[in-house]
Amino acid sequence: GAIEACGHKVLTLPEYQGKVKAEDVENYISNFYADDTYLHMVAPGMLYISFPTEYGTIYSKKELQDIHSVCKKWDIPLYIDGARLGYGLAAEGNDVSLQDIANLCDVFYIGGTKLGALFGEAVVVCNDSLLKNFFPLIKQHGALLAKGRLLGLQFECLFSNNLYERVSRHAVDMAMKIKQAFIAKGYNPVVNSNTNQQFFLLPND
């Protein structure tokens, strides 16, 4: 995909309902550097996770803290995909705040289009050392918007009067009604998701 088209390599880890475990990250990196031929292999350079995941599951604060600690130990950035961040923050049982997200990663982004914005996402860089040459890289990849202020205006609105939180909460509440309606009809969810991502297996008939 887009990552490998830019010259990087995607290295996969085991997933548990869409999530990765800190011990798997630790084992992968430690085993990599324990190999005498590691200089001839693709080095792990960043950890990419999603909150919530593609299954709608969410990481606990403890899970994020553990993953963050491993990344710090091995000096690799932690990137959190927040395309549906608002729905994760609004999920019942979530103990992670927006401030926690900022404290426990190097870069994350706040999804816009999946919460009602017309276009764009807001990238939040928490590690200033990663900003070197960031603007030239944006231009190099053809990603510099001519009227970027219009993107920013959307987030100014979303983060006024708790709109971002209200939109997220409403979507999750509606999803829970749909979830309960399916369960009442005898269908079981593929995973237990408390976000607006709900997946059920239905018979072909």
Model-derived segments and spans:
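Conserved PLP-enzyme active-site core in the AAT-like
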Residues: 1-205
